[in-house]
């Protein structure tokens, strides 16, 4: 259920690595860049994502230059697995970025979110980590943590846009 709220994950759980690996596989098979455990009916605070890794810093260029460089040089896989992620600080500047979701396939909307964040989490090796993220990765982390809190990306857009998307999605779902 997509609006399930995830509960704190016990780090001693032996199944954790299997769950995280299965989540990554599910995400890759769906051509997604992020997945929260709550999206696949696991009420734990687990997220996985892969926004790719580049050999250049996107902060040094415009979004157009960045997209052109990606097209020319490609992106290496860079999976990230987070247990009990928590955003501890964020930039006051909001950036609008188009978002989609595996829970509402085929529908996108522009969402404003902090352009950079700092997140603490435990990795699959039970190491506590802090990550500073910006750009697409920051958006993806916020989107997935929202899922853990029962929030969808459409909850961040106007009521009218949300209703239009939901009506279309329900109509599409009813056809199948």
Give the residues covered by each predicted segment.
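Short pre-active-site segment immediately N-terminal to the catalytic Zn-binding motif
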Residues: 123-139
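Flexible, small-/acidic-enriched active-site or ligand-binding loops
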Residues: 98, 102-112
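Charged, well-structured alpha/beta interaction segments
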Residues: 22, 26-39, 43, 47-50
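Single conserved hydrophobic/aromatic residue that forms the stacking wall/gate
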Residues: 1-6, 11
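Helix-adjacent hinge/juxtasegments
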Residues: 45-97
